[in-house]
Amino acid sequence: MGTASRSNIARHLQTNLILFCVGAVGACTLSVTQPWYLEVDYTHEAVTIKCTFSATGCPSEQPTCLWFRYGAHQPENLCLDGCKSEADKFTVREALKENQVSLTVNRVTSNDSAIYICGIAFPSVPEARAKQTGGGTTLVVREIKLLSKELRSFLTALVSLLSVYVTGVCVAFILLSKSKSNPLRNKEIKEDSQKKKSARRIFQEIAQELYHKRHVETNQQSEKDNNTYENRRVLSNYERP
């Protein structure tokens, strides 16, 4: 029994040693998150970029926090001396027990617009997963004053109400125009019908007049022809011996 137990313990220790050598046991893994976008105007005296991290299987020692900035010029390493004073351009605050750090940009100007990256590392751990950076926060400093959220919400609601009002006015105008155009259209149709009837009546009267005139002329010509024929007949009878 003792020999079997000792053998199992030795096998377990060998397995742990192998796993530790390949990094399966005690592997330190970090993940870092930070806001991807921040926008302020020149009236802000300072802006703070927050960074949170989570560590799994890492040593109990406190990690190191680093900040980088990528702007229009060369990338910069920020706050290598700590940046603990608010009189500095940048101020770093660390709450490592709560897994939180932050970078404050003081006396904000448009030149501070850049991408700020938070980095967390356990220097004693050689693995790459023990040194991670966030996705970066794009800071945009506007040279014009931005509207507050309350004012933007109010303006959005006002624009929506105006859109509804304008739509209602347009619909009412269209309906009113249609209602006014219908009587005029009916009147025009009626007048056109009366004009057509009047024209038809005039044409009929003209046709009747022409027919009557032609009929009278035909009768007169017929009577004239008959008289001529009778005169010729009488003359013929008179000339016979």
Curated annotation (Swiss-Prot):
Gene3D superfamilies, per the entry: Immunoglobulins
Signal peptide: 1-27
Other comment: This gene is localized to a locus associated with inflammatory bowel disease. It is coded entirely within the intron of METTL9 which is transcribed in the opposite strand of the DNA.
Bilayer topology term: Single-pass type I membrane protein
Region (Disordered): 214-241
Name listed for the protein in its UniProt record: Immunoglobulin superfamily member 6
GO molecular function, one term: transmembrane signaling receptor activity
Cystine pairings recorded for this chain: 51-118
UniProt keyword annotations, A-Z: Disulfide bond, Immunoglobulin domain, Membrane, Signal, Transmembrane, Transmembrane helix
Comp. bias (Basic and acidic residues): 222-241
Record flagged with keyword Lyase: no
GO cellular component, one term: plasma membrane
Any Gene Ontology biological process: immune response
Induction: By TNF and CSF2/GM-CSF in dendritic cells and down regulation by phorbol myristate acetate (PMA) and ionomycin in monocytes.
All ranges on the Cytoplasmic side of the membrane: 175-241
Ranges annotated as spanning the membrane: 154-174
Gene label: IGSF6
Topological domain ranges for the Extracellular compartment: 28-153
UniProt-annotated location(s): Membrane
Span of domain Ig-like C2-type: 30-134
Protein's UniProt keywords contain Transmembrane: yes
InterPro entries: Ig-like_dom, Ig-like_dom_sf, Ig-like_fold, Ig_V-set, IGSF6
Tissue expression from the record: Expressed in peripheral blood lymphocytes, spleen and lymph node, with low levels in thymus, bone marrow and fetal liver. No expression in non-immune tissues.
Organism the protein comes from: Homo sapiens
